[in-house]
Amino acid sequence: IGTEYGLQRPKESLFHRNFMGMCDNARRKTSAVFGGLSMLYEFCAENFERVPAAIDAGARRIELCDNLAVGGTTPSAGVISATVSYAHEHDARVMCMIRPRGGDFHYNQDELRMMEMDLGLAVSAGVDGLVFGCCKPCAGGWALDELTLGALVMAAGCATEECKREPIDITFHMAFDQLSPEAQLDAIDTLADCGITRILTHGGAAGTPIEDNLEHLSRLIECAGDRLTILPGGGISTANRDTVAAALGVSELHGTKIVPLEV
């Protein structure tokens, strides 16, 4: 894992010059097109309860998890099966969270085995992709845990082969935000080399307004290029999704409030 790519740091984006103008012209509707790109809204669902309403409101992809109060954990087999069945009947896809507990993203061998078993069950239930992330302590901060990452990617590949399925999507979730900004740029190389499809990221510390993180998100998007997709999430709602998408030039957004739902 971790082939070197000779990373070049992208230049700072100038999107802030017209961002406020975009805010004034934001359109609040279920689907949108920016620069010829059709938008895909990924709804973060805690269990099945709000999945039908979210799909009806325009979500074309579901990130399915449990326990959002701790950032999301692996949902039950029954919830996965019901969600996959409903989503596929309504032209939507399902990404399943694989996370054995709340807290940090540093997993021991027992937890790794649990994750491997859970992702196997999810793949056999027909999910379209998996969502996981792993970090390890490093010099007072966090670094990408390449060994655990490699084991999970390999387990996902084995599971799809056993089910005679095509390779599925893998999203590296917001564990990515535990890395320093510069380490994130370096981690993109490793994640792309491992075959990760997309990175879900807020672009900054949890709780900060997404608008404060747009410049760094722009750097990540430039660095990733066409190797993988940067999926902005956290603090994006129907109120600001159009302006965020237009400012970053992305075609996918993630959130619990990304489509209009009744409270």
Language model regions located:
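Hydrophobic faces of well-ordered beta-strands that scaffold small-molecule active sites
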Residues: 41-43, 62-64, 94-98, 130-132, ...
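Active-site-proximal loop/turn and secondary-structure-junction residues that shape catalytic pockets
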Residues: 45-49, 66-68, 100-102, 134-138, ...
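Active-site-adjacent beta->alpha loops and helix N-cap segments on the catalytic face
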Residues: 49, 69-86, 137-155, 179-185, ...
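Catalytic cores of alpha/beta
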Residues: 49-51, 106-118, 179-193, 236-250
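Glycine-rich phosphate-binding active-site loops on the catalytic face of alpha/beta enzymes
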Residues: 63-72, 125, 131-138, 196-209, ...
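Glycine/small-residue-rich loop that forms an oxyanion/phosphate-binding "nest" at active or ligand-binding sites
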Residues: 92-145
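C-terminal alpha-helical cap/extension of soluble enzyme domains
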Residues: 99-103, 206-210, 214-263
